[in-house]
Amino acid sequence: MNTIHVDVVSAEESIFSGEARFVALPGESGELGIFPRHTPLITRIKPGSVRIEMADGSEEFVFVAGGILEVQPNCVTVLSDTAIRGADLDAEKAEKAKLEAEEALKNAKSEVDLARAQSELAVMAAQIAALRKFRQKR
């Protein structure tokens, strides 16, 4: 069976390393699907869920807050400042952070504050969506 090696790495630690049949993730220009022997590619990724289909058919989910994707024919590497295993996502914490980002957006006093709040809100909304997707698959 054809597989591709997948590494998902955050600034703090390696989140996932293993063999997979398929990887799906949110590219900057749309959803990307990576199979073994994919053409080499480097691109930015948006906040969202990385779905890793294992060789046995099971799935692993990882939330990433954006980052960089590198694809080689036999290897996929996802680099993200923040990456959280689907099983470790905390709905209460994510909702609280989303509310704080919405409040920061309302109270932004400069364009920098506004951009920072918008970015944080987008990340938290993507994390909540990833959490819902993970719960549906369980």
Curated annotation (Swiss-Prot):
It is found in: Cell inner membrane. It comes from the Bacteria. The keyword Ribosomal protein does not apply. Its main location: membrane. The gene is atpC. It holds the Pfam family ATP-synt_DE_N. F-type ATPases have 2 components, CF(1) - the catalytic core - and CF(0) - the membrane proton channel. CF(1) has five subunits: alpha(3), beta(3), gamma(1), delta(1), epsilon(1). CF(0) has three main subunits: a, b and c. PANTHER family: ATP SYNTHASE DELTA/EPSILON CHAIN (PTHR13822), ATP SYNTHASE EPSILON CHAIN, CHLOROPLASTIC (PTHR13822:SF10). Belongs to the ATPase epsilon chain family. It is a peripheral membrane protein. One of its GO terms (molecular function) is proton-transporting ATP synthase activity, rotational mechanism. GO terms for cellular component: plasma membrane; proton-transporting ATP synthase complex. The keyword Transmembrane helix does not apply. Produces ATP from ADP in the presence of a proton gradient across the membrane. This is ATP synthase epsilon chain. Keywords: ATP synthesis, Cell inner membrane, Cell membrane, CF(1), Hydrogen ion transport, Ion transport, Membrane, Transport.
